[in-house]
UniProtKB/Swiss-Prot annotation:
GO terms for molecular function: structural constituent of ribosome. SUPFAM superfamilies: NTF2-like. The keyword tRNA-binding does not apply. The lineage of its organism: Eukaryota, Metazoa, Chordata, Craniata, Vertebrata. This is Large ribosomal subunit protein mL45. Component of the mitochondrial large ribosomal subunit (mt-LSU). Within the mitochondrial ribosomes, required to direct the nascent polypeptide toward the tunnel exit and position the exit at a distance from the membrane surface. Keywords: Mitochondrion, Ribonucleoprotein, Ribosomal protein, Transit peptide. Belongs to the mitochondrion-specific ribosomal protein mL45 family. Component of the mitochondrial ribosome large subunit (39S) which comprises a 16S rRNA and about 50 distinct proteins. The gene is mrpl45. It comes from Xenopus tropicalis (Western clawed frog). GO terms for biological process: mitochondrial translation.
Amino acid sequence: MAASMRMYRAVGALGLASILNPARMAAPVLVMPTRTKKRYFIPPAVGAKHKTMADMISKARAAGVVTPHETMERPINIACTAGIFDPYIPPEGDARLSSLSKEGLKQRTQQLKQTAASQLAIRKVKEYDSEFTTKTFPEKAQELFIAAHQCLTKFDRHELHTLVTERCYPEMVRGNRYRTIQWSFVESIEAPRVVQVRCPEMVSKGNLYAQVTVRMHNKQSLTIYDRFGRVMCGSEEPRDVLEYVVFERHMVNPYGTWRMHGKIVPSWAPPKEPIVKTVLLPGPAVDPLQELEDISLEKTEPVLQQWYK
């Protein structure tokens, strides 16, 4: 009995020593590397048969290659339209022909149709904007026109977005990154006036967009310099400019405002002045021991080229 008690105490002491020994607490771990089959995604051959797009996608997923989901939808913007509804066709020379002639009678009939359509559109606009009138709107449109061009000369894109639509913005700023624009409004030769109003429905019934065409005849000065400071287009002398500017507003939007949407260029308008392109003319090879004054250089005038769309 005493021997068994001593044996039990010895075993208990060894067990306690094994528990308190940190070296014996960590049991040996045997790590055996096992090699598994590694699958690679191999694209099918060019002339392989019975290989559909679904089969290739399933094999790619089995190999662990996840193809991103590509949507074929194009984002659209409903804050403005993508064009001009029924663009106003100004008479040639902006003059009225005699009603006794055939062309004058046709012009008069066309004007009556446009006036009737404009009156119906004005009624729709006044349902959403009670302060809209054809007498006060031209002055507001001219102020908006001047402010938009002043922001263009200062390259204030944040303010310009509030004055022009998303369709007009890229047309105004395209190609002007390395150019310097100087524009100024001198005076109005004739008071601006509304020549056409359109308010059609788009996408769904009741979604109205209003477009007002304003005739502006004024004096402006425009000069465009390239990045080297050379004059590309225009001059500092004021010129008479006759423009038909279109302003648009999303009538359903309670926070919508009138913004400049585009310009109508008549077919009889004179062509624009070509922009002088700055090019590098290769000169003659100069000997290091030769003076520049000894070389006769031929001066050539730059050729005017059409450099706009």
